[in-house]
Amino acid sequence: RACGIIMNCNTGAVLAMATAPSFDLNNPSELKSSFDLQTLAEMKESGATEEELDAKEASLREQQWKNKAITELYYPGSVFKTVTCASALEEEVVSLNSTFHCAAYEMVAGTKIKCWSSYGHGTLTLQQAVTKSCNPSFIQIGQLLGKDKFCDYFEAFGFTEPTGIDLPGESGSLYVSRENMGLVELASSSFGQTNKVTPLQMTTALCAIVNGGYLVTPYVVDKMLDSDGNVVKTTETRIKRQVISEETSVQMRQILETVVNENGGSNAYINGYRIGGKSGTTEKIDEYNKLKAETGVDHMTYVPSFAAFAPADDPQIVMLVMADTPTGTQYYGSAVAAPVVSAVFKEGLPHLGIYPTYTAEELAKMDAAVPYVMGMEAQRAEAKLNAEGFEVRYVGDPASGATVSTQIPASGSSIPKGSTVVLYLGNEYDLESAVIPDVTGMTVSQANE
C-alpha cells in the first residue's frame, strides 16, 4: 500500500492525506486491493480451510481501513538523512565545507555496513553526501554528532511521541533508546534504517527543517461551524518548540534544492518552480529476517519514498509520498515516489497561489507547439520556425522557390524547443510505405543505422 501527505509547513494544516488502495465507504467490507484478492485466491488454491480464509480476509479488511499515514510504522530510510544533516549543522560538528570518504562500506564496531554504491563514492562534500545519499558519509556524520546529541535531536524533532494530530488511532514510533544505543545502532540510525516512525512524524520533522526550525502540531480540522454556519471554533497554529535555527534551516533548504536540481531528485524537478527534496529507499529488514528464519527464503522488500517542499526559497508546503513494497521492477524512491510528487506539485501549486517563474534556460528547453508552415516558401517557413525556437532541415532545394509540401512533425505537435522540424519542398515527399525494422534490444546507435 502507499500513502501521501501534504502539509502547510508553517501552520501544520494538513491539506491532503491519502492511502491507496482505499475502500468504498458505501461498502467498506469489500476488499478493493487486487493483491489482497490474489492472496486469498492463492491461499484457497493451496488448501487453506474456511476458518483460515475467513481470518485472513478479516485481517486484510481491517488493514484496508487503516490510515497508513498515521497508524503504520516504517523505516524512513534516506529521507531521515535530512534530520541527521540538520542536527549536525546546528551543532556545528559539520559545515558545508566538511568532507567525508566512502569506500563502499564503513566498519563500525566490527560490523561492515555497506553503501548502496558497490564502487564507493570516494571523497564527498556535505552537499555531495546528501545528493548521492551516501550511507558511509552519514555514518561518519552520526559519529561526529554522537549518541547523546543524536538522541536529543531525535526527540526534539518529535519522533519519540505521536504528533498530536486531531485524528484517532495515531501510532507512536518504535526506536532504540538512548540507553540501548550502541555504535552500530547509531550508525544505522544516522541514515534512517533502525528506528521506525509514522509517515506523519517524518513529514512534521521535515516541516521543521525547512520552515525556520519550528516543530508544529499537524491538524485536519481548520474550523468548526454551528448549524447556522457560524464559526464556533478555529484551530490555531501550535508551535511545540524551535529545534534548529533559521540559519541552519536556510542551509538545509539550499542543500535539498540542489538535490532536486541535480541527479538525486531530478524526477521531482518542475520547470518554473524551486523544489527541494530527498529520496529514500528502505530495506524492510525485520520482515526479511523473519521470512528467512521461517522459510529459508532470501528475499528483501523495500519501501521507496520521496519528501519535498516548495517553493525552496520560501517554503509553504511539504509533501511525503511512500509506497510499501512496490511490485514493479523499480523500487528506488527517486524512481517510484518522486514522479508522484512532481505530478501533484505541478497541478496543485497553482491552486495554492504558487505560480511558476521560468528561467531563461528553462524557457529555452520547454516544449512548444510546432506552427503550421505548409504552402510557405522555404525562407518564410524557416523564419517562422526559428522564431518559435525550432531548427529546420530541408528535403529539397530551398533556393528553388518551391513551397513546403509536408512538415514533420505535423503542426500542433508539442516538442522541445531546439528540436529540428523537417520540411519537404515541392514533390520531394515520398508517399511510398516502408516496413519499419524491429530495433528492440538495440543500442541507440545500432537503431539509427
Stretches found by the model and what they are:
Residues 2, 8-79, 83-323:
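Beta-lactam-recognizing serine transpeptidase/beta-lactamase-like catalytic domain environment
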Residues 235, 272, 286, 311, ...:
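Ligand-recognition elements built from short beta-strands and adjacent flexible loops
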